[in-house]
């Protein structure tokens, strides 16, 4: 680096006023305005840095350092912050910078950031400027040491997500400042990220800042970084090498534990394509052979005298056995409508098979389903079905005549009662007419005997002997069981008593 450039930068640092930081009784959440760095160049720009939490730090370049880039990045939702330390053998000069916390009352989003080149002029990267950052040309930054605490450096960066970068930034390259992940107490000093400029580059009013890609190196090839420890309670930051060792040990322990669990437990079969089960289909019957299993008491096991079903046995024997099992499960099995699938598994070291499942699928036509559901329309209505159609046919008509059944029952009962009354009346009328006829004949006979017969032509016929009644007297003078006797048994005296009344 030319000495003139170093001297000019040193003069700028000596002439720049120290930053003002608010200490004392203020809390860690108060916003601190950043100091302004003024330069003796053509244009002087003072901006406010509104990124990060309230942190005040003092950097002193009193020790020479090697040309090894020192990289520190903070965990932020945006890009990491890189702070390169260029080579410098000059001493003296203090640079004080302060980073203020993002104002909570701001409503504008940081869409773009305005950066200042090495000469002090500010160039906009485009868009609305929500945040601004001022860079001062410094050439005497050495190894970072905190004046108040020379042994420990306070930082809240998380090295788990810290990428090690090889900075190749030019004087016009912007540096992204990301918000810190924890707030520091007021009074403690934390190193701030300040870019350095190499060489004196003339700047113009409308200089365009160009981004240069940074090359990311793997975590294993990290450069010599200074161990950083945090004094914040509950947060400890380890160096990159220690983090790598801890991660490696953690991964190793996890792998050993996983291997130990697998070795002590049941052997796990490596995942791979499963072997498809052979399926034989003949007509409406299917035979599905699954992998061999051990005999189980809950399974139906069939010992076979011939070759097993899952082996290359004749299809006729398989079909016969499958058909027999399917018809046994469903007596009304119809090959035209039903499909039977038999799932079996051969038994290890035995000529037997285990019947695992018998599935019968019934293929019904829509017409058959409609006829079955038609009879249960009331149940469908209760289940939430409002309509059912098959072509032009709809749900069955509902009979809303609630009095039809009681009316029919009443009519039948009344008809039965009328028939019963008519039968009783017929029987009574027949008996009455018979009594009247007998009484009339008796009166006529008595009139004829007394001679007062009106009809002279009336002839009284002799009754046959079988119709005459006469008491039979036994030898002992007692009446017998029957008093009807034939006419021949009458005595002559009885016959003389009869007179011929015929004129």
From Swiss-Prot:
N- and O-linked glycosylated. Sialoglycoprotein. Residues 426-503 are cytoplasmic. InterPro entries: CD34/Podocalyxin, PODXL. It comes from Mus musculus. Residues 20-50, 131-183, 222-236 have a biased composition (Polar residues). It is a single-pass type I membrane protein. Monomer; when associated with the membrane raft. Oligomer; when integrated in the apical membrane. Found in a complex with EZR, PODXL and NHERF2. Associates with the actin cytoskeleton through complex formation with EZR and NHERF2. Interacts (via the C-terminal PDZ-binding motif DTHL) with NHERF1 (via the PDZ domains); interaction is not detected in glomerular epithelium cells, take place early in the secretory pathway and is necessary for its apical membrane sorting. GO terms for biological process: cell adhesion; cell migration; epithelial tube formation; leukocyte migration; negative regulation of cell adhesion; negative regulation of cell-cell adhesion; podocyte development; positive regulation of cell migration. Disruption phenotype: Die within the first 24 hours of postnatal life from profound defects in kidney and/or gut formation. They are anuric (no measurable urine in the bladder), and fail to generate the extensive interdigitated foot process and instead retain cell junctions between immature podocytes. The chain crosses the membrane at residues 405-425. Belongs to the podocalyxin family. Residues 19-236 are annotated as: Disordered. The keyword Repressor does not apply. It holds the Pfam family CD34_antigen. Involved in the regulation of both adhesion and cell morphology and cancer progression. Functions as an anti-adhesive molecule that maintains an open filtration pathway between neighboring foot processes in the podocyte by charge repulsion. Acts as a pro-adhesive molecule, enhancing the adherence of cells to immobilized ligands, increasing the rate of migration and cell-cell contacts in an integrin-dependent manner. Induces the formation of apical actin-dependent microvilli. The gene is Podxl. One of its GO terms (cellular component) is filopodium. Keywords: Cell adhesion, Cell membrane, Cell projection, Glycoprotein, Membrane, Phosphoprotein, Signal, Transmembrane, Transmembrane helix. It comes from the Eukaryota. Glycans are attached at residues 25, 89, 94, 145, 154, 167, 206, 303. The keyword rRNA processing does not apply. This is Podocalyxin. PANTHER family: PODOCALYXIN. Its main location: membrane. Residues 1-21 form the signal peptide.
């Amino acid at each position: 680096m030319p000495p003139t450039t170093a001297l000019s930068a040193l003069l700028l640092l000596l002439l720049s006023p120290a930053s003002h930081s608010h200490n004392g009784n203020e809390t860690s959440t108060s916003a601190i305005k950043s100091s302004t760095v003024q330069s003796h160049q053509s244009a002087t720009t003072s901006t406010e840095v509104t990124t990060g939490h309230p942190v005040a730090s003092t950097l002193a370049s009193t020790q020479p350092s090697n040309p090894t880039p020192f990289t520190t990045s903070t965990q932020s939702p945006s890009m990491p912050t890189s702070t390169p330390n260029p080579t410098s053998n000059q001493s003296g000069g203090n640079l004080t910078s302060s980073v203020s916390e993002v104002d909570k009352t701001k409503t504008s989003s940081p869409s773009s950031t305005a950066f200042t080149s090495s000469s002090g002029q500010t160039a906009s990267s485009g868009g609305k400027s929500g945040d601004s950052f001022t860079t001062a040309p410094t050439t005497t930054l050495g190894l970072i040491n905190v004046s108040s605490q020379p042994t420990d450096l306070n930082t809240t960066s998380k090295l788990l997500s810290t990428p090690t970068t090889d900075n190749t930034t030019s004087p016009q390259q912007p540096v992204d400042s990301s918000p810190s992940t924890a707030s520091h107490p007021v009074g403690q000093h934390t190193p701030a990220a300040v870019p350095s400029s190499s060489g004196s580059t003339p700047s113009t009013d409308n200089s365009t800042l160009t981004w240069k890609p940074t090359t990311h190196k793997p975590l294993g090839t990290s450069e010599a970084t200074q161990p950083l420890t945090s004094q914040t309670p509950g947060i400890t930051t380890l160096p990159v090498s220690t983090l790598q060792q801890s991660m490696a040990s953690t991964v190793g322990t996890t792998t050993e534990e996983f291997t130990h669990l697998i070795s002590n437990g049941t052997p796990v079969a490596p995942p791979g394509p499963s072997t498809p089960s052979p399926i034989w289909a003949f007509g409406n019957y299917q035979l599905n052979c699954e992998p061999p299993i051990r005999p189980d008491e809950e399974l139906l096991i069939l010992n076979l005298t011939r070759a097993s079903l899952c082996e290359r046995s004749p299809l006729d024997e398989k079909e016969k056995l499958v058909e027999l099992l399917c018809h046994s499960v469903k007596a009304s099995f119809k090959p035209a409508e039903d499909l039977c699938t038999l799932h079996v598994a051969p038994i290890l070291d035995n000529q037997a098979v285990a019947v695992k499942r018998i599935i019968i699928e019934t293929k019904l036509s829509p017409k058959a389903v409609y006829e079955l559901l038609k009879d249960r329309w009331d149940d469908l209505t209760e289940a939430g079905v409002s309509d059912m159609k098959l072509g032009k046919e709809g749900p069955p008509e509902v009979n809303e005549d609630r009095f039809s059944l009681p009316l029919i029952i009443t009519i039948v009962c009344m008809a039965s009662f009328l028939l019963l009354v008519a039968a009783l009346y017929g029987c009574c009328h027949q008996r009455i007419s018979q009594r009247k006829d007998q009484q009339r004949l008796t009166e006529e006979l008595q009139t004829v005997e007394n001679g007062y017969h009106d009809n002279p032509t009336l002839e009284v016929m002799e009754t046959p002997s079988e119709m005459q009644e006469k008491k039979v007297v036994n030898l002992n003078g007692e009446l017998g069981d029957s008093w009807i006797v034939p006419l021949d048994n009458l005595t002559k005296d009885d016959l003389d008593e009869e007179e011929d009344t015929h004129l």
